[in-house]
Amino acid sequence: MVIQKWVGARVGLMGNPSDGFGGKTIACLVRNFGAQATLRESSTVEIVRHPVYDPLSFSSLEHLEETAAHDGYYGGIRLLYATCSKFRHYCRERGIQLPDRNFALQYDTNIPRQVGLGGSSAIIAAVLNALMEF
C-alpha cells in the first residue's frame, strides 16, 4: 500500500503571524508550490531522509559549511519525526486505537525556503493527511 498526499504552499496576505496567538489571517494557496508525503507499509517505522534537504554526506567541509549557511541546521526530518510523535500522542490520549502496522515515510517539496510560503506547515499537513489515511 502506498499513500501519497500533497499540500499546497500558502502566502499570508494579512494577519501573519497573529494566527499563532489566536488572531485571524487572510491567506491564499500558491498552487505552483507544494509538499508531498509518501507513506508505504513497512516492517519497521522508518523516516526516510530527503537526499537534498537532509544531507548527511558532503563533498568537503566547505560544502558542509555552505549548506549549513544556506539551509540552516535543520531539514525536514525533524518535521516528520515530530508529526508522527504528536499524532501517536494525540491518538493515545483520546483512546483512538491505531492499527498495529508500520510504515516508511518520506517527503518532497518544491516550496522555496525562508520566503513565507509555509513550507514547514505544508510538509506537516501532508504527513498528517497520510497518517490519517493509513
Segments and roles (model prediction):
Residues 1-117, 129-134:
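ATP-binding N-lobe of GHMP and related small-molecule kinases
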Residues 120:
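Short, conserved phosphate/pyrophosphate- and ester-handling motifs at nucleotide-, phospho-/glycolipid
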